[in-house]
């Protein structure tokens, strides 16, 4: 998100509670991408995929969110590829063919799950460059004149009388001082890593 905002020249600020950008899953999923087309993969049955993801979630999901990923993840991949391949010369490794399917006998003896052709990764390029994907994004936004406020955690979301989010109160992990950041357009929260947050796990 920060890389996209930086590319568009938006006025934004990004905070990170850790001292450096964190690791991420080595591959990401995207449907019917340019990489999939180049590999000769058949188009995904999107209605069936929506049904499969909803089944896996026991129906406890917002299908609008799932549809957004199904319908827009290809554009996300094109954006990522434009940076990693266009700016850094990396090569996308796309998993397809027999490696991207369930064994045929699975449908005969077990539930016939739908597994979409979706895995994209840049692991070989990460290793060769000595830089992980998120580090490449950090380098990209810094080259465009932006920076990341590390060791800065979210303390509170601020709202106006109507309930609209107007900004945040952040707190420095170094000396504990508070920082008010006003947001004219909005606040984007990246809340991954649930297993590392005991309080959040208890709430769930």
Task: Give, region by region, the residue ranges found by the protein language model.
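Conserved redox-cofactor binding core of oxidoreductases
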Residues: 70-177, 198-199
